[in-house]
Amino acid sequence: MEAIPAIGLICGVDEAGRGPLAGSVVAAAVILDPARPIDGLNDSKKLTERARERLAPLIRERAIAWAVAEASVEEIDRLNILHATMLAMQRAVAALGCVPDLVRVDGNRCPPLAVPAEAVVRGDATVPAIAAASILAKTVRDAQMIALDGEYPAYGFASHKGYPTPEHFIALRRHGVVACHRRSFAPVRELLDNPELWPAGTLT
Protein backbone atom coordinates (compact mmCIF):
# COMPACT_ATOMS: atom_id res chain seq x y z
CA MET A 1 0.00 0.00 0.00
CA GLU A 2 1.13 3.54 -0.75
CA ALA A 3 1.79 5.96 2.09
CA ILE A 4 -0.84 8.65 2.54
CA PRO A 5 0.40 11.85 0.82
CA ALA A 6 0.91 14.82 3.13
CA ILE A 7 -1.09 17.29 1.05
CA GLY A 8 -4.27 17.59 3.07
CA LEU A 9 -7.44 15.55 2.99
CA ILE A 10 -7.18 12.64 0.55
CA CYS A 11 -10.45 10.97 -0.40
CA GLY A 12 -10.52 7.47 -1.85
CA VAL A 13 -13.45 6.47 -4.06
CA ASP A 14 -14.49 3.08 -5.39
CA GLU A 15 -17.63 1.30 -6.56
CA ALA A 16 -19.28 -2.07 -6.29
CA GLY A 17 -21.76 -3.58 -8.67
CA ARG A 18 -20.86 -2.57 -12.21
CA GLY A 19 -21.08 -6.09 -13.60
CA PRO A 20 -24.24 -7.62 -12.07
CA LEU A 21 -27.50 -8.06 -13.94
CA ALA A 22 -29.53 -6.81 -10.98
CA GLY A 23 -29.45 -4.20 -8.25
CA SER A 24 -28.02 -0.71 -7.97
CA VAL A 25 -24.40 0.32 -8.39
CA VAL A 26 -22.93 1.57 -5.10
CA ALA A 27 -20.02 3.95 -4.56
CA ALA A 28 -18.19 4.94 -1.40
CA ALA A 29 -15.91 7.84 -0.55
CA VAL A 30 -13.52 7.66 2.43
CA ILE A 31 -11.07 10.11 3.99
CA LEU A 32 -8.81 8.14 6.31
CA ASP A 33 -7.27 9.56 9.47
CA PRO A 34 -3.47 9.04 9.42
CA ALA A 35 -3.53 9.11 13.23
CA ARG A 36 -5.91 6.15 13.35
CA PRO A 37 -4.54 3.51 10.95
CA ILE A 38 -6.53 0.41 10.06
CA ASP A 39 -4.66 -2.85 9.58
CA GLY A 40 -5.72 -5.21 6.83
CA LEU A 41 -7.07 -2.78 4.23
CA ASN A 42 -7.02 -4.28 0.75
CA ASP A 43 -9.08 -4.56 -2.40
CA SER A 44 -12.46 -5.83 -1.17
CA LYS A 45 -12.44 -8.58 -3.80
CA LYS A 46 -9.28 -10.03 -2.23
CA LEU A 47 -10.81 -10.15 1.25
CA THR A 48 -13.16 -12.74 2.66
CA GLU A 49 -16.68 -11.72 3.54
CA ARG A 50 -15.78 -12.10 7.21
CA ALA A 51 -12.79 -9.76 6.81
CA ARG A 52 -14.89 -7.16 5.01
CA GLU A 53 -17.55 -7.28 7.71
CA ARG A 54 -14.85 -6.83 10.37
CA LEU A 55 -13.20 -3.90 8.60
CA ALA A 56 -16.30 -1.95 7.55
CA PRO A 57 -17.26 -0.73 11.05
CA LEU A 58 -13.63 0.13 11.79
CA ILE A 59 -13.53 2.29 8.67
CA ARG A 60 -16.72 4.09 9.69
CA GLU A 61 -15.41 4.59 13.22
CA ARG A 62 -11.88 5.76 12.42
CA ALA A 63 -12.24 7.67 9.16
CA ILE A 64 -12.29 11.46 9.18
CA ALA A 65 -15.27 11.24 6.84
CA TRP A 66 -17.06 8.61 4.79
CA ALA A 67 -20.16 8.35 2.65
CA VAL A 68 -21.94 5.74 0.56
CA ALA A 69 -24.23 6.52 -2.37
CA GLU A 70 -25.80 4.66 -5.25
CA ALA A 71 -27.38 4.91 -8.67
CA SER A 72 -30.58 2.95 -9.09
CA VAL A 73 -31.46 0.27 -11.59
CA GLU A 74 -33.63 2.83 -13.38
CA GLU A 75 -30.71 5.26 -13.61
CA ILE A 76 -28.42 2.49 -14.88
CA ASP A 77 -30.91 1.66 -17.64
CA ARG A 78 -31.44 5.31 -18.54
CA LEU A 79 -27.82 6.52 -18.43
CA ASN A 80 -25.80 3.29 -19.01
CA ILE A 81 -23.66 1.63 -16.36
CA LEU A 82 -20.59 3.86 -16.84
CA HIS A 83 -22.46 7.13 -16.39
CA ALA A 84 -24.51 5.70 -13.54
CA THR A 85 -21.29 4.67 -11.78
CA MET A 86 -19.87 8.16 -12.20
CA LEU A 87 -23.11 9.57 -10.78
CA ALA A 88 -22.91 7.33 -7.72
CA MET A 89 -19.30 8.42 -7.16
CA GLN A 90 -20.27 12.10 -7.44
CA ARG A 91 -23.02 11.57 -4.90
CA ALA A 92 -20.67 9.83 -2.48
CA VAL A 93 -18.10 12.63 -2.60
CA ALA A 94 -20.83 15.28 -2.24
CA ALA A 95 -22.20 13.49 0.84
CA LEU A 96 -18.89 13.49 2.76
CA GLY A 97 -19.69 16.57 4.82
CA CYS A 98 -16.25 18.07 4.18
CA VAL A 99 -14.28 19.03 1.07
CA PRO A 100 -11.23 16.89 0.28
CA ASP A 101 -8.07 18.40 -1.19
CA LEU A 102 -7.69 15.50 -3.62
CA VAL A 103 -9.94 12.66 -4.72
CA ARG A 104 -8.30 9.42 -5.86
CA VAL A 105 -10.61 7.14 -7.82
CA ASP A 106 -10.05 3.47 -8.54
CA GLY A 107 -9.79 2.72 -12.25
CA ASN A 108 -8.87 4.72 -15.32
CA ARG A 109 -11.34 7.61 -15.21
CA CYS A 110 -12.81 10.07 -12.74
CA PRO A 111 -16.30 11.51 -12.46
CA PRO A 112 -16.67 15.28 -12.91
CA LEU A 113 -15.96 16.79 -9.50
CA ALA A 114 -15.51 20.28 -8.08
CA VAL A 115 -12.18 19.29 -6.50
CA PRO A 116 -8.92 17.92 -7.97
CA ALA A 117 -9.14 14.23 -8.80
CA GLU A 118 -6.96 11.52 -10.27
CA ALA A 119 -7.66 8.00 -11.47
CA VAL A 120 -5.50 5.21 -10.04
CA VAL A 121 -5.46 1.90 -11.87
CA ARG A 122 -5.64 -0.92 -9.31
CA GLY A 123 -5.99 1.76 -6.66
CA ASP A 124 -8.08 -0.55 -4.49
CA ALA A 125 -4.95 -2.67 -3.99
CA THR A 126 -2.44 0.18 -3.59
CA VAL A 127 -4.15 3.21 -2.01
CA PRO A 128 -5.50 2.70 1.52
CA ALA A 129 -8.36 5.20 1.18
CA ILE A 130 -9.53 3.55 -2.04
CA ALA A 131 -9.29 0.11 -0.42
CA ALA A 132 -11.43 1.39 2.44
CA ALA A 133 -13.97 2.77 -0.03
CA SER A 134 -14.07 -0.55 -1.87
CA ILE A 135 -14.86 -2.35 1.38
CA LEU A 136 -17.70 0.01 2.31
CA ALA A 137 -19.19 -0.11 -1.18
CA LYS A 138 -19.00 -3.89 -1.33
CA THR A 139 -20.51 -4.51 2.11
CA VAL A 140 -23.36 -2.07 1.54
CA ARG A 141 -24.20 -3.53 -1.86
CA ASP A 142 -24.00 -7.11 -0.58
CA ALA A 143 -26.47 -6.19 2.17
CA GLN A 144 -28.82 -4.74 -0.44
CA MET A 145 -28.69 -7.95 -2.46
CA ILE A 146 -29.35 -10.07 0.63
CA ALA A 147 -32.43 -7.92 1.25
CA LEU A 148 -33.53 -8.45 -2.36
CA ASP A 149 -33.12 -12.19 -1.81
CA GLY A 150 -35.83 -11.96 0.81
CA GLU A 151 -38.08 -10.19 -1.68
CA TYR A 152 -37.26 -12.52 -4.59
CA PRO A 153 -36.19 -15.81 -2.97
CA ALA A 154 -36.24 -17.79 -6.22
CA TYR A 155 -33.30 -15.90 -7.73
CA GLY A 156 -30.45 -16.63 -5.31
CA PHE A 157 -29.39 -12.99 -4.92
CA ALA A 158 -27.87 -13.67 -1.49
CA SER A 159 -25.34 -16.04 -3.02
CA HIS A 160 -24.43 -14.53 -6.40
CA LYS A 161 -25.25 -10.87 -5.57
CA GLY A 162 -26.82 -10.37 -8.97
CA TYR A 163 -23.77 -11.36 -11.01
CA PRO A 164 -24.25 -13.38 -14.23
CA THR A 165 -23.64 -16.82 -12.75
CA PRO A 166 -25.13 -20.07 -14.07
CA GLU A 167 -27.47 -20.09 -11.07
CA HIS A 168 -28.73 -16.62 -11.95
CA PHE A 169 -29.24 -17.49 -15.62
CA ILE A 170 -31.23 -20.58 -14.65
CA ALA A 171 -33.43 -18.47 -12.36
CA LEU A 172 -33.98 -15.89 -15.10
CA ARG A 173 -35.05 -18.56 -17.57
CA ARG A 174 -37.24 -20.28 -15.01
CA HIS A 175 -38.89 -17.28 -13.35
CA GLY A 176 -38.41 -14.33 -15.70
CA VAL A 177 -37.22 -10.75 -15.23
CA VAL A 178 -38.20 -8.84 -12.07
CA ALA A 179 -38.11 -5.16 -11.13
CA CYS A 180 -34.54 -5.18 -9.80
CA HIS A 181 -33.05 -6.51 -13.05
CA ARG A 182 -31.13 -4.16 -15.33
CA ARG A 183 -33.11 -4.19 -18.54
CA SER A 184 -30.29 -2.55 -20.51
CA PHE A 185 -27.92 -5.47 -19.86
CA ALA A 186 -27.72 -7.95 -22.74
CA PRO A 187 -28.84 -11.19 -21.00
CA VAL A 188 -31.87 -9.44 -19.50
CA ARG A 189 -32.66 -7.57 -22.71
CA GLU A 190 -32.52 -10.85 -24.64
CA LEU A 191 -35.28 -12.27 -22.47
CA LEU A 192 -37.36 -9.13 -22.85
CA ASP A 193 -36.90 -9.16 -26.63
CA ASN A 194 -37.80 -12.84 -26.92
CA PRO A 195 -41.03 -13.51 -24.99
CA GLU A 196 -41.00 -17.14 -26.09
CA LEU A 197 -38.05 -17.67 -23.72
CA TRP A 198 -40.11 -16.59 -20.71
CA PRO A 199 -41.98 -18.98 -18.45
CA ALA A 200 -45.73 -18.81 -18.97
CA GLY A 201 -47.40 -16.02 -17.03
CA THR A 202 -44.27 -14.09 -16.06
CA LEU A 203 -43.93 -11.52 -18.87
CA THR A 204 -44.88 -8.05 -17.63
Swiss-Prot record:
Q: What is the annotated localization of this protein?
A: Cytoplasm
User: Looking at the keywords, is Nuclease present?
Assistant: yes
An annotated GO cellular component of this protein is: cytoplasm
Q: Which keywords does the record carry?
A: Cytoplasm, Endonuclease, Hydrolase, Manganese, Metal-binding, Nuclease
Major localization listed first in the record, in broad terms: cytoplasm
According to its UniProt record, this protein's enzyme class is hydrolase
GO MF assignments: manganese ion binding; RNA binding; RNA-DNA hybrid ribonuclease activity
Q: Which family does it belong to?
A: Belongs to the RNase HII family.
| Protein name, UniProt field | Ribonuclease HII
Q: Which organism is it from?
A: Aromatoleum aromaticum (strain DSM 19018 / LMG 30748 / EbN1) (Azoarcus sp. (strain EbN1))
The organism that produces this protein has a lineage beginning with: Bacteria, Pseudomonadati, Pseudomonadota, Betaproteobacteria, Rhodocyclales
User: What is the primary gene name for this protein?
Assistant: rnhB
